[in-house]
């Protein structure tokens, strides 16, 4: 069944019909979902979801946009929640320079990225990395940590070149691929998907964002992942069923140690 490794069902976009959508997942071929924390102090929604739905798991961490409001208490809370049975990763963490142009902001993000990578290492959990307009700095920090007995991880919503992808693949990491792969102008990502072994790819939505064609611009959900599987299958010259089976196995191997 489909394994969605990165979703945000605690987002307000689902406030009107959250239970209805999540209750339809099994019939839609979706077997597992990881709901990923993002905002500092916004962990409650993920906690509620992993308690309410047996097939929903959690990742706990803070998105780089909130690095400036993180405190030691935030880091302590991430560590505490990482001990929960259904918390399977630290994320989403990383660097985002798109809106944050100042060097001081970059240093702050890097400090909080490293602090959360330390938690991932010490708690023996995989990481989920968000990286936007920060290719070199993200790669440098990940390389540094991958020498320190990490438990692997996913480069979420991968958007860089095939050369950068090759560096992550050499480290044994996974690339998260979602709706962007179906976009006509996604030439760079299609090149990455062509060179990346299927054994190092996982499917993700980043819902409610990043809906694939033919639903681009609408609210996304895990039920759209067959479109992504089909696009990846066409690139690889295999069936969508094989894509779904292998990416599910990949996700379980990384996140469940299965």
Regions found by a protein language model. Give the residues of each.
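Mid-domain alpha/beta scaffold segments of enzyme catalytic cores
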Residues: 1-258
């Amino acid at each position: 069944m489909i394994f969605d490794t990165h979703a945000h069902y605690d987002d307000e976009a689902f406030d009107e019909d959250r239970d209805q959508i999540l209750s339809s997942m099994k019939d839609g071929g979706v077997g597992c979902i990881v709901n990923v924390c993002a905002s500092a102090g916004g962990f409650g929604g993920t906690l509620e979801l992993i308690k309410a739905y047996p097939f929903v798991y959690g990742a706990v961490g803070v998105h780089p946009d909130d690095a400036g409001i993180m405190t030691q208490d935030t880091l302590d809370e991430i560590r505490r929640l990482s001990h929960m049975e259904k918390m399977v990763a630290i994320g989403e963490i990383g660097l985002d320079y798109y809106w944050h142009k100042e060097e001081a902001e970059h240093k702050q993000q890097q400090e909080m990225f490293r602090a959360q990578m330390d938690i991932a290492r010490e708690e023996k959990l995989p990481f989920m990395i968000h990286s936007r307009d920060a290719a070199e700095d993200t790669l440098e920090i990940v390389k540094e940590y991958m020498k320190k007995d990490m438990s692997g991880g996913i480069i979420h919503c991968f958007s860089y070149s095939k050369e950068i992808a090759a560096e992550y693949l050499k480290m044994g990491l996974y690339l998260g691929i979602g709706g962007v792969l179906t976009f006509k102008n996604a030439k760079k990502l299609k090149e990455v998907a062509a060179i990346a072994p299927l054994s190092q790819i996982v499917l993700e939505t980043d819902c409610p964002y990043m809906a694939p064609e033919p639903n681009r611009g609408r609210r996304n959900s895990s039920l759209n992942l067959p479109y992504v599987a089909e696009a990846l299958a066409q690139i690889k010259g295999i069936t969508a069923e094989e894509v779904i089976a292998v990416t599910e196995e990949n996700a379980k191997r990384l996140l469940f140690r299965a």
